[in-house]
Every structure is written in structure tokens, then in C-alpha cells.
């Protein structure tokens, strides 16, 4: 009993050491999405440097009694869209700030592989952009151009797995998460009094758009998967056609071989029938006549003739007199 306990203890120590050796994920400082946030720098927005495994919370603050509530719709966009402050083409909604009575919290987890098919996935050394083209009013919630992205530089630039002290050239390869819409990321709303988290349902105002992150725009992963599917279908069709052709050729060869064998067998039977002596009469010949058949068979035996000699050449038979009958075969008289 002591050995199993010692083995479990050693295994627990090894697991603890592995956890300590692995890089610890951290939660980044939450970002309050409001026009009064001084972190949004003019012309640049907010630049952060997350690592794989980190988490980021974007907070839509609750309305203050003395100030009007700001309505925003946040999008995950490409670099050219963030620079132009336009979400006309391929809009991808992350969260909608439209609940003045409560705080809305949107959590992003930076992960390379998501357990959810529709989850967000990020790659190292790439940039991702979040912005809003709403103007802060309820009527301007659905604006697709300009908005606070242009007037207040309200955008977040996420440089995943990059060093903030490194000198990075201007031309960078930017892309969106390779998977489509984010089902794993939850929008948790809290009431300051009760602190009861609730997950918003898709389709309602203020929830994440579940239709997909790259619904209309080109996606390398999606296109590669479609090409692979079509290639597999084409290869399957070609293999199926080749199998059908092979079976047809094999069937034709088998039928030809069977037909040839049947013809040879029929010809052998006809020659054997012509050469075999039948139990027929002498058709008017004398008792001493000698008949040499075309072919003899050892198995056939007729009681009215007797084999005299067959050691050299054709066998010789002495035919006895029988009543005249119609001959069935042809014989040569010697």
C-alpha cells in the first residue's frame, strides 16, 4: 500500500512543477468603452500587447445619473477598415452597448486553438483591431462610417505575442481570427447591487452577433477547407469511375473466355460423335468386310462386332451380320 501512495505523491509534485514552469496567463487591465476614457489616444487609439492565454475585458459602463448614456456597437475589423473607420463591408459585431441600467462586460480570451468550432482564435505576431462607428446616440447606433472611431479615435489595436519595445515596421500582416463568430466568449452583465451575472442570448439587443466573424469576406482557412472538400470529392469520383471501368473490362474478358471454352467443348463433342462407332448394321456389306472408323473410343462397346487387333495403326474390327438399320455415322470401307 505504501508504493501506490508514494507514486501518487511523486506524480502530484511533477504536475506542480510543470505548472510552475509553464508561463502564467494573466488578465489584462479592463478597457472602459466610453468617450471619456483617456486611454484612447488621438490618431492611435489604445494599443495593447497580449500574449496567448491572456484575457481582456471590454466594459460598457452603466449610465450615470447626470450624464447621457452612450450607445455603441463594437466590431472586430481589419486594418484597412480600422484606418478608414468603416464597417460597411463585412461587419462583425462583438458587443452592443445599449443597456443604460446595467454594466455590460465582454471578455476576450487570446487562444491559438478554441475548443468551440465557432470560437475566436488568434495567431502570434499578428494585429487585430476593435472599433466602433456609432456616434454615441441611439439613432446613430447603426452607423457604419465615421462615428467615434473618427472623432475620438476609439479603437483598440491588439498586437498578439509581440514585444512592445521592439521596432516594428509599418507594413504588417494583419488578419482576423481564423474561426468564425465567437460562441465561447461570453457577455456578462452585472447589476452593481446584486452582482448576479447573466449571459445574454444571441439575437437580442446588446448581444454578440453569432452569424460569423468572416461571413462574407474571404478567409484563408475557409477557402482551404472548401478546396480540400472539392478535391476529395473529385478524387472519389475518379476512383469510382476507374473501378467501374475495371469491372466492365474484367466482365468482358470472363465472358469471352467462357464463350471460347464452350465453343472448343462443342467442337470436341461433334468430332467424338462422328468418330465413335455405333451399333448399326453392315448396310448390305459382306461378312468379311473390314471397317476402319475415323476415331474410336475405348469406352464404347457394341456386342455385334469384335476387336481383332489394335496394337499397330488403327484398330481392326470384325463386324457380324445384323439386320439392316439406318446408319448414324459415316464409315470408310477398305
Swiss-Prot record:
Residues 26-231 are extracellular. One of its GO terms (cellular component) is cytosol. Keywords: Developmental protein, Differentiation, Disulfide bond, Glycoprotein, Membrane, Neurogenesis, Phosphoprotein, Signal, Transmembrane, Transmembrane helix. Pfam families: Ephrin. The chain crosses the membrane at residues 232-252. GO terms for molecular function: ephrin receptor binding. Disulfide bonds join 60-97, 85-149. Residues 175-218 are annotated as: Disordered. Its main location: membrane. Inducible phosphorylation of tyrosine residues in the cytoplasmic domain. It is a single-pass type I membrane protein. Residues 26-160 form the Ephrin RBD domain. Glycans are attached at residue 135. A motif (PDZ-binding) lies at residues 332-334. One of its GO terms (biological process) is axon guidance. Residues 1-25 form the signal peptide. Residues 253-334 are cytoplasmic. It is found in: Membrane. Residues 207-218 have a biased composition (Polar residues). Cell surface transmembrane ligand for Eph receptors, a family of receptor tyrosine kinases which are crucial for migration, repulsion and adhesion during neuronal, vascular and epithelial development. Binds promiscuously Eph receptors residing on adjacent cells, leading to contact-dependent bidirectional signaling into neighboring cells. The signaling pathway downstream of the receptor is referred to as forward signaling while the signaling pathway downstream of the ephrin ligand is referred to as reverse signaling. Belongs to the ephrin family. Binds to the receptor tyrosine kinase EPHB2. Interacts with GRIP1 and GRIP2. This is Ephrin-B1. It comes from Gallus gallus (Chicken). The gene is EFNB1.
Amino acid at each position: 500500500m505504501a508504493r501506490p501512495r508514494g507514486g501518487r505523491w511523486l506524480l502530484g509534485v511533477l504536475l506542480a512543477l510543470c505548472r510552475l514552469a509553464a508561463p502564467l496567463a494573466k488578465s489584462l487591465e479592463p478597457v472602459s468603452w466610453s468617450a471619456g476614457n483617456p486611454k484612447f489616444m488621438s490618431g492611435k487609439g489604445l494599443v495593447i500587447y497580449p500574449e496567448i492565454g491572456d484575457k481582456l475585458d471590454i466594459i460598457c459602463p452603466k449610465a450615470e445619473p447626470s450624464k447621457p448614456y452612450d450607445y455603441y456597437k463594437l466590431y472586430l475589423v481589419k486594418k484597412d477598415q480600422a484606418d478608414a473607420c468603416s464597417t460597411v463591408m463585412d461587419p462583425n459585431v462583438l458587443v452592443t452597448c445599449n443597456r443604460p441600467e446595467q454594466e455590460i462586460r465582454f471578455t476576450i480570451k487570446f487562444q491559438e486553438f478554441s475548443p468551440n468550432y465557432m470560437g475566436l482564435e488568434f495567431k502570434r505576431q499578428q494585429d487585430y483591431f476593435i472599433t466602433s462607428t456609432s456616434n454615441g446616440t441611439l439613432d446613430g447606433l447603426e452607423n457604419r462610417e465615421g462615428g467615434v472611431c473618427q472623432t475620438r479615435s476609439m479603437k483598440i489595436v491588439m498586437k498578439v505575442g509581440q514585444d512592445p519595445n521592439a521596432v516594428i515596421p509599418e507594413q504588417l500582416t494583419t488578419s482576423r481570427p481564423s474561426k468564425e463568430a465567437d460562441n465561447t466568449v461570453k457577455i456578462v452583465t452585472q447589476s452593481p447591487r446584486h452582482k448576479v451575472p447573466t449571459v445574454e442570448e444571441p439575437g437580442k439587443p446588446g448581444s454578440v452577433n453569432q452569424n460569423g466573424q468572416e461571413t462574407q469576406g474571404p478567409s484563408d482557412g475557409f477557402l482551404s477547407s472548401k478546396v480540400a472538400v472539392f478535391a476529395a470529392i473529385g478524387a472519389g469520383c475518379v476512383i469510382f469511375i476507374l473501378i467501374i471501368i475495371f469491372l466492365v473490362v474484367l466482365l468482358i474478358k470472363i465472358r469471352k473466355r467462357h464463350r471460347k471454352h464452350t465453343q472448343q467443348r462443342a467442337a470436341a463433342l461433334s468430332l467424338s460423335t462422328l468418330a465413335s462407332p455405333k451399333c448399326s448394321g453392315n448396310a448390305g456389306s459382306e461378312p468379311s468386310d473390314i471397317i476402319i472408323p475415323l476415331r474410336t473410343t475405348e469406352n464404347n462397346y457394341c456386342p455385334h462386332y469384335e476387336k481383332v487387333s489394335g496394337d499397330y495403326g488403327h484398330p481392326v474390327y470384325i463386324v457380324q451380320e445384323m439386320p439392316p438399320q439406318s446408319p448414324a455415322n459415316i464409315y470408310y470401307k477398305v
